[in-house]
Structures are given as C-alpha cells and as structure tokens.
Amino acid sequence: MKNKKIAALLGLLLAGSMAFSLSACGTSSSSSSDTSSTDTSTTTDSSDSSDSSDDSAGFEEIQVDEDNSDQEVGPLTVNAVYFQPIDMEPSGMGLKAADASFHLEADIHANQKGTELGYGKGDFVPDLTVNYDIIDNSTNESVGSGTFMQMNASDGPHYGANIKLDQAGSYKLVLSIESPEKKGWMLHVDPETGVTGKFWTEPLEVTFPNWNYTPQEW
C-alpha cells in the first residue's frame, strides 16, 4: 500500500513537470513570433523611409560657381544654383518649363549681421527685389536679365526664374539685391522692441564670375 502511494505521488510530480515544460515552450514560441513580427515591421518601415528619401531626391542642384558659393554681403548670405526647368503657379508669371533651359535659383538667408535686423541667423529673407544679369565672359555682353520671383519649393523658399540659355560657354552671373524697405517692410525702432540695424539704402551686388555652363539634357 505504501509503495502504491509513492508511485502515485511520483506520477503527479511527473505530470506537473511535463505541463510546466509545455507551458514554457508555448511562451518561448509566442515571444519568438512577436520578435519576428516586430523585426518585419521595422524592416518594412525602414524600406518605406528609404523609398521616401529616394523620391524626394528627384533633382540635382548644380552650383553656378563652385569657387564663389555662399557669399557674405551685408546682412545676407547668397548662393546661386540651377537645375531642370520647373512649372510654377500661378501660371503665366514666368517662362514655361517647356520653353526654358534651366531653373536659376538664388538662396538668400540672414547671416550674423542679419540678426541686427530681427532675422534669425540662417532665416530666409523675404520681400527682396533680386535683379539678375547673365554676362558672356568672352564678349562682356549681357545674354539675359530680369527680376527673380520669390517662391516656395519642397526644400523651402527662394528667389528664382526659368531661364533660356542654349549656348555653352563661360558666363558671369550678377545679382543686384534691394532691401525689403522698397516693398514697404518696416523696422521697430523703440527701446523696448526695436532692432539695432538699418536696411541698406543702395542695392547689394553679388557676382558669380566663373560660371562654366554646359546645356543639360534633363
């Protein structure tokens, strides 16, 4: 009788041990499945992010003058780039992309001196009048001039225009930049809220003298 009780007790212990073992296996399998699901989700998110990044890089900016980029003039930092012609709205305000050779862009931001006018360093400076002149270095004659429009693109605001220029060669780009005061922009001058700087009264001139231009097949 005593032996039967011992045998029964051993049987119960064995059954309990097997049940615990099966339970542990189930937990491990579920955890592994969850981890696999998380890894798959992470991979998918990473892939989507990569695709999105590739889609946003749909154009290549070309420096007008590599040796004279990001020039400091007065309170401004000025650079010039170009890329494929683009369509803009409202229509009719500039040359159609189909009729242009490229889109010429002036990136103009406030530098440290520009903070005296109330801009943050690196901020886009709006309401400037930006006149451009493209000069053939071989003849010193203008081959195109006008006034840039201000506009927004996916990478931020800038000044620009679609330009027609078919002839390869060495050119000089000259920008003449008039202050926002011309368009009625005002500055606070009181002791409590005023700025310490003053708008420039004569146009600021920026020159990109070494533009080695080659027409592109966009």
Segments (PLM) and residue ranges:
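Short amphipathic, basic-aromatic surface patches that mediate peripheral association
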Residues: 87-89, 104-123
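Short coil-to-beta strand junction motifs in C2/discoidin
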Residues: 100, 119-130
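Short beta-strand elements
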Residues: 186-218
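Sec-dependent N-terminal signal peptides of Gram-positive bacterial secreted proteins and lipoproteins
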Residues: 2-28
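Aromatic sugar-binding surface patches on proteins
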Residues: 153-160
